[in-house]
Amino acid sequence: MTAMTPGSNLPLSAVRVAVDVTAPVRLDVSGLLLAADGKVRSDDDFVFYNQPAGSGVTHSAAAGGGDTITVDTAAVPDGIEKIVVTASLDQPGATFAGTEPTGTVRNADDNSVLASFTPPQLGAETALVVVEIYRRSGAWKVRAVGQGYANGLAGIATDFGVSVEEPAAPAAAPQAPPAPPAPAAPAGQWGPPAGTPA
């Protein structure tokens, strides 16, 4: 097993690889299939717990454990250059400060560990790109990334071309129509009689 450092890469000896991302806190792990322009082709290339399968990439969640992104490199379409594996914190308002997530790359067929990576010096980040599985000269490699985002998974998804729906702003309470003006009181009614000095 190889312990990777940020920016390091190594060739993959397995056709099917699984990337587990674990931490002392609950993480949401996802995978994005990126074309040569560094963007998804459509929102279908965003693989996560609500959309657990894409072209050659699947998401699975272990009971009580971390999420896994599995990449079958033989089934990834030719137009896809890399699969980015991300992690975001499940707890609203939480950051990675003091949390050390570890990405473990395994052979998905025999479960042997190929590499691991723990991004260093995390702080205000709420989401990060952990590793990427990428195609180079017809072969597949893994690169340790560790790039953090302060705007969560939505920030990562937007950077890679996924359409992210902004949460709807709370609807303003309807305003009551203005009260109709009170009719003018006829002279002499509710006051001194007309022509009487006040």
PLM regions and their residue ranges:
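Intrinsic-disorder/low-complexity signal
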Residues: 1-198
